[in-house]
Amino acid sequence: MLERIKVCFTESIQTQIAAAEALPDAISRAAMTLVHSLLNGNKILCCGNGTSAANAQHFAASMINRFETERPSLPAIALNTDNVVLTAIANDRLHDEVYAKQVRALGHAGDVLLAISTRGNSRDIVKAVEAAVTRDMTIVALTGYDGGELAGLLGPQDVEIRIPSHHSARIQEMHMLTVNCLCDLIDNTLFLHQDD
């Protein structure tokens, strides 16, 4: 058992090192995409399933409340938090539409959809991205594996942050770290005006 614990930590560290080498440009582009949207008076819609839903909710909470520094609230909505809306849509046998319907109702040109999917193939996340495209929204996608179907939907203005791993737990860990990086960069850019 002790050896297995060491393996888990080692795999996580190795994934972090690989991500630290591969992802800074994509994370920086994503942060600037989010910052520009916020500066233009727009909002961020976030979605994911399971652990990805928790990461989406963490991002929205960090925008609305704060990340590490007291500052004004920023407009972000986690689309996975309203159980009444989710179950009403799913009850009509439209589970694949649980996020897309919300994107069509709440999303506007200039808004950003933060779509989080470990494999990039979750039908409801794919449909949300398709809906965001019809609303002239920009997409920031956090993925893993080969990016899945989600990666193929992204345009030149969109940003994919693909964790260099084929292990779901490591990808989800890195998604949380990436969300924290995005929150830090947004706060740093909008309120601290430091460029490290």
UniProtKB/Swiss-Prot annotation:
| Record-linked CDD domains | SIS_GmhA
Q: Which domain of life does the protein's organism represent?
A: Bacteria
Name the UniProt key words of this record, in alphabetical order. Answer: DNA replication
Q: What are the GO BP annotations of this UniProt entry?
A: carbohydrate derivative metabolic process; DNA replication
Q: Do you know which InterPro entries this protein is assigned to? A: DiaA, GmhA/DiaA, SIS_dom, SIS_dom_sf, SIS_GmhA/DiaA_subfam
All residue ranges annotated as the SIS domain in the record = 34-196
Coiled-coil parts of chain: none
The terms under GO molecular function for this entry are: carbohydrate derivative binding
Tell me the subunit arrangement. Homotetramer; dimer of dimers.
What does the record give as the function of this protein?
A: Required for the timely initiation of chromosomal replication via direct interactions with the DnaA initiator protein.
The family database entries (NCBIfam families) matched by this protein are listed as: PRK10886.1 (NF008138)
The UniProt entry's sequence similarity note says: Belongs to the SIS family. DiaA subfamily.
Per its record, how is this protein called by name? DnaA initiator-associating protein DiaA
Its ancestry begins with: Bacteria, Pseudomonadati, Pseudomonadota, Gammaproteobacteria, Enterobacterales
